[in-house]
C-alpha cells in the first residue's frame, strides 16, 4: 500500500481500499500517470 498522492497504475490498482486511482488535474500536460486520491465518502 503506497498511500495518498502517489503514482498508480489504473490497470493494476495497488492503492489501499480507502484510496482510488484517478487522473490528476492537468493529466497529459503536467502529469503522465494516474495518482491515488482519498475516496470521497458519501
Swiss-Prot record:
GO terms for molecular function: calcium channel regulator activity; sodium channel inhibitor activity; toxin activity. The keyword Secreted applies. GO terms for cellular component: extracellular region. It is found in: Secreted. Disulfide bonds join 1-16, 8-21, 15-30. Keywords: Calcium channel impairing toxin, Disulfide bond, Ion channel impairing toxin, Knottin, Neurotoxin, Secreted, Toxin, Voltage-gated calcium channel impairing toxin. Inhibits voltage-gated calcium channels (Cav) in rat cerebellar granule cells. This is Omega-theraphotoxin-Asp3a.
Amino acid at each position: 500500500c503506497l498511500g495518498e498522492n502517489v503514482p498508480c497504475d489504473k490497470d493494476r490498482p495497488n492503492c489501499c481500499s480507502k484510496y482510488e486511482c484517478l487522473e490528476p488535474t492537468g493529466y497529459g500536460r503536467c502529469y503522465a500517470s494516474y495518482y491515488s486520491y482519498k475516496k470521497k465518502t458519501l
